[in-house]
Amino acid sequence: MLGDAQQLELGRCAPADIALTVAATVVSRQDCRSGLRRIVLDCGSKILGSDRPAWATGFGRLIDHADARIAALSEHHATVVWPDDAPLPPVGTRLRVIPNHVCLTTNLVDDVAVVRDATLIDRWKVAARGKNH
């Protein structure tokens, strides 16, 4: 119904079909001469969940940055390997992350912000938050 990165990677939906993303902020960036380019986002396993099927290429995807991959998660941060041919976003940039498994993300939050055209239009309380027993 909402779509997620697993469905996207399987080709069952397009990025435009994804109805739920996580707003994340770039909190660090690294552009090494050795070629390692990455950013760190302020969203980790406590918001994205840690599900990663063996066939998945990361722990989530980024809207508008199809070649970027979330390579690692800690509780509060996501490390994103950034493509060589794209400029690294500055610290403070807000990015939209598609979680691998949208069910986990909605189970991990108290409410969902409903945004249309960058404007907050509603907030939905997650009535079943944490009720997976």
Swiss-Prot record:
GO MF annotation: an example: D-serine ammonia-lyase activity
Name of the protein this chain belongs to: Uncharacterized protein Mb1449
Cited SMART domains: D-ser_dehydrat (SM01119)
GO biological process: D-serine catabolic process
